[in-house]
Swiss-Prot record:
Keywords associated with the record: Amino-acid biosynthesis, Aromatic amino acid biosynthesis, Lyase, Pyridoxal phosphate, Tryptophan biosynthesis
Pathway(s) it belongs to: Amino-acid biosynthesis; L-tryptophan biosynthesis; L-tryptophan from chorismate: step 5/5
Designated name of the protein: Tryptophan synthase beta chain
Subunit (UniProt): Tetramer of two alpha and two beta chains.
Entry-linked InterPro entries: Trp_synth_b_CS, Trp_synth_beta, Trp_synth_beta/beta-like, TrpB-like_PALP, TrpB-like_PALP_sf
GO molecular function annotations of the record: tryptophan synthase activity
A GO cellular component annotation in the UniProt record: cytoplasm
Catalytic activity: (1S,2R)-1-C-(indol-3-yl)glycerol 3-phosphate + L-serine = D-glyceraldehyde 3-phosphate + L-tryptophan + H2O
Organism: Phenylobacterium zucineum (strain HLK1)
Length: 406
């Protein structure tokens, strides 16, 4: 099959049907269509409203703490001996990751729509914490669905959500991880349509979510562009970010998609190795199919049953990828690499020791591919890596990997 041709303007996507080429769309039951149409119309109106955008910008500045710094990682750069490495410090946001950018946008939209109850799904717990945080700020009840396996491995975040007033509902069905949490949240939404807003955390799901989450996260790329021009007087040679559903990555990538000189790299979770079948690399180890309302690359068996994803990182442990990433892969605009659990843990240790920054295990997957990427762009090159979250939540996981008791 021939690869689809590259578009003249990446900003023109998705189309009116919510599609990025063959991907995306609205594969949802009839009962959900009125909700999806209502949400799409409300978002389009908010997007075009300067008052909404000004209110969001105000909260991002004074509550979230934006702009986040673009930091030159001098010792890491020296260690690899190649291109200059800059880190976009999303882990310095309020709540410790990029997730709050999207939550703030969506909570303002929910209020605008008159919704009085918020539900969300979470994997690593970062989106759950960010959702619980904005719900506390605006005085709205919050229910967070979380796979029972993730509840176990992310106890600090579960406690943080409880402290913020959210109810965390463990999900035991399926693999008891993010996919199953999303299934339960969708069931809740259909049942409680009149008052409930479903605040999806990733650039996945049915249209308009992939577009909406991307738009709220694109502040990352817009700031990066401004900051790198100020620091270096030119655009970077490459961007790199970890990809599960892919919201942090698309937030960094999107404002640069029309700049053909900028190479784009996403890094999927290879778990124990793509060849072992125990991984979460939807593009490198999956094929197109439909899940959670959209067409995208998925981990599935020969008859199309969704297979369990595996990653040491709860935030990347999802059997699919956002539809815009699937399309960027097919048209050749972005390259999707992989990093194993072991490589990510090694990168976690390296950044901690060289720069005094504990990265989230999710972000560590992107860090693991820096040797190849810095080599590819050369000694005079510039690489920007999105440090999507902080690693405080992962110290227990890292300790057990190192055979240490905390």
């Amino acid at each position: 099959m021939n690869a689809p041709s590259r578009p003249n303007d990446y900003a023109a996507y998705p189309d009116l049907k919510g599609r990025f080429g063959d991907y995306g769309g609205q594969y949802v039951p009839e009962t959900l269509m009125p909700l999806v149409h209502e949400l799409t119309a409300a978002y389009e109106a908010a997007k075009a409203d300067p008052a909404f955008q000004a209110e969001l910008a105000g909260y991002l500045t004074h509550y979230v703490g934006r702009p986040s710094p673009l930091y030159f990682a001098e010792r890491l750069t020296r260690h690899y001996g190649g291109a200059k490495i800059y880190l976009k410090r999303e882990e310095l946001n309020h709540t410790g990751s990029h997730k709050i950018n999207n939550c703030m946008g969506q909570i303002l939209l929910a209020q605008r729509m008159g919704k009085t109850r918020i539900i969300a799904e979470t994997g690593a717990g970062q989106h759950g914490v960010a959702t619980a945080t904005v719900c506390a700020r605006f005085g709205l009840p919050c229910v967070v669905y979380m796979g029972a396996v993730d509840v176990e491995r992310q106890k600090p975040n579960v406690f943080r959500m409880n402290l913020l007033g959210a109810e965390v509902r463990p999900v035991t069905s399926g693999s008891a991880t993010l996919k199953d949490a999303m299934n339960e949240a969708l069931r809740d939404w259909v049942t409680n349509v009149h008052d409930t807003y479903y605040l999806i955390g990733s650039a996945a799901g049915m249209h308009p979510y992939p577009m909406m989450v991307r738009d709220f996260q694109a502040v990352i790329g817009r700031e990066t562009r401004e900051q790198i021009l100020e620091l270096e007087g030119r655009l970077p040679d490459a961007l790199v970010a970890c990809v599960g559903g892919g919201s942090n990555a698309i937030g960094l990538f999107h404002p640069f998609l029309n700049d053909s000189s900028v190479k784009i790299f996403g890094v999927e979770a290879a778990g124990e190795g793509v060849e072992t079948g125990r991984h979460a690399a939807a593009i490198n180890g999956g094929r197109p199919g439909v899940l959670h309302g959209n067409m995208t690359y998925l981990l599935q068996d020969r008859v199309g049953q969704i297979e369990e994803a595996h990653s040491i990182s709860a935030g990347l442990d999802y059997p699919g990828i956002g539809p815009e990433h699937a399309w960027l892969h097919d048209v050749g605009r972005a390259t999707y690499l992989t990093a194993t659990d072991t490589e990510a843990l090694e990168a976690f240790r390296l950044l901690s020791e060289l720069e005094g920054i504990l990265p989230a295990i999710e972000s560590s997957h992107a860090l693991a591919r820096l040797p190849e990427i810095t080599r590819e762009v050369g000694k005079d090159g510039i690489v920007v890596l999105n440090l999507s979250g902080r690693g405080d939540k992962d110290v227990n996981t890292v300790a057990s990997y190192l055979g240490r008791q905390i």
